């Protein structure tokens, strides 16, 4: 049995002569494959607060989040429903709100494609000074 094993171990292998499957015959311009990034759809938007009280002249920053966090289009559109009461200064996922006069206003945030929105009611109270 040992002799049969030794005989198998001493066999010589001949080189491959069939070059049709070799690297030399590969296509010079292989087809290009591109993978498009997957689009992650927005499923909602959430504002951090839904009711706020501020004084006239006071500034406050409010933020909103696109859901899911990995969504492809993270653009938000901010709207002010009563520009006599507040002024808004949108910047990305935040908006700075300034109280102008006493009253109630609504700030709405909408996703860029318009499918989802959230809102915050802002109550602006007059700024009181101490009487003399």
UniProtKB/Swiss-Prot annotation:
A Pfam family reported for this protein in Swiss-Prot or TrEMBL: Big_2
Annotated organism of origin: Bacillus cereus (strain ATCC 14579 / DSM 31 / CCUG 7414 / JCM 2152 / NBRC 15305 / NCIMB 9373 / NCTC 2599 / NRRL B-3711)
Source superkingdom: Bacteria
Domain BIG2: 45-115
Family to which the UniProt record says this protein belongs: To B.anthracis BA1245.
Full protein name: Uncharacterized protein BC_1230
Family annotation (InterPro entries): Big_2, Invasin/intimin_cell_adhesion
């Amino acid at each position: 049995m040992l002799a049969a094993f030794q005989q198998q171990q001493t066999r010589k292998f001949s080189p491959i002569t069939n070059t049709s499957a070799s690297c030399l015959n590969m296509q010079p311009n292989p087809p290009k494959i591109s993978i498009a990034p997957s689009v992650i759809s927005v499923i909602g938007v959430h504002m951090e607060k839904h009711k706020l009280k501020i004084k006239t002249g006071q500034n406050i920053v409010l933020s909103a989040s696109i859901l899911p966090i990995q969504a492809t289009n993270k653009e938000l559109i901010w709207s002010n429903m009563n520009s006599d009461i507040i002024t808004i200064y949108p910047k990305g996922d935040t908006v700075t709100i300034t109280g102008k006069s006493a009253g109630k206003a609504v700030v709405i945030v909408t996703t860029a494609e318009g499918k989802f929105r959230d809102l915050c009611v802002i109550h602006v109270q007059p700024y009181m000074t101490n009487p003399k």
